[in-house]
């Protein structure tokens, strides 16, 4: 009589633990100042008809911050709104064999925000388990003809959907200059490992400190996911 088979393995899927976060940032000009402030503080500030706090001051929209200026002639710049940016969308895949290069020509920018990520990140074992994986990217600037690594980034975790992250590059070279993204991790050659990488966009940032004299304003920053992304 033959031996019975071993106990069947039930595949285990690790939880997704990578989540993109995008902040919505806006300044709203209320009118000519000076005027009185919000009657009920943050409860008086509505986003999609939803107040930032309830009557007891507890957050209704988590992660939101707001600043207020009444419209004085000598008012200070709103904190957290000291820069403006122009985003250029790319959405291009980055492979080990083909780094992606772009040229920056804008003369007056102070910094660059580089947004990149993975289409998904998961490794499936021979037993069907779906586990976290990792992938490494280099973000480089060309300085005096040489490629210099400014950021060495490893994305480590699991996600079955797109995940994006951002880094800021300061101390930029004289314009024009080249920027490139290099994939250090070998490209996957099997469906068992999903780790395609992409360069989503770059944002040219100019540092500004505007006071908006004689204008009453509200500045709001909130996680875009609170309103469907």
Residue ranges and their predicted role:
Residues 1-229:
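Polar, S/T/G-rich
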């Amino acid at each position: 009589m033959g031996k019975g088979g071993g106990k069947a393995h039930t595949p285990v899927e690790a939880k997704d633990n990578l989540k993109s976060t995008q902040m919505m940032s806006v300044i709203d000009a209320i009118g000519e100042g000076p005027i009185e402030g919000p009657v009920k503080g943050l409860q008086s500030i509505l986003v999609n008809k939803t107040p930032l706090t309830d009557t007891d001051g507890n957050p209704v929209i988590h992660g939101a911050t707001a600043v207020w200026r009444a419209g004085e002639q000598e008012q200070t710049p709103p904190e957290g709104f000291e820069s403006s940016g122009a985003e250029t969308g790319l959405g291009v895949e980055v492979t080990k064999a083909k780094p992606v290069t772009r040229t920056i020509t804008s003369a007056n920018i102070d910094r660059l925000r580089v947004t990149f990520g993975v289409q998904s990140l998961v490794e499936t074992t021979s037993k069907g388990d779906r586990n976290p994986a990792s992938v490494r990217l280099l973000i480089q600037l060309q300085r005096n003809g040489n490629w210099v690594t400014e950021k060495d980034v490893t994305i480590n975790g699991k996600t079955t959907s797109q995940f994006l992250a951002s880094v800021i590059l300061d101390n930029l070279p004289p314009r024009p200059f080249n920027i490139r993204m290099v994939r250090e991790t070998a490209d996957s050659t099997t469906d068992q490992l999903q780790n395609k990488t992409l360069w989503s966009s770059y944002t040219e940032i100019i540092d500004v400190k505007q006071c908006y004299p004689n204008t009453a304003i509200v500045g709001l920053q909130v996680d875009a996911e609170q309103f469907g992304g």
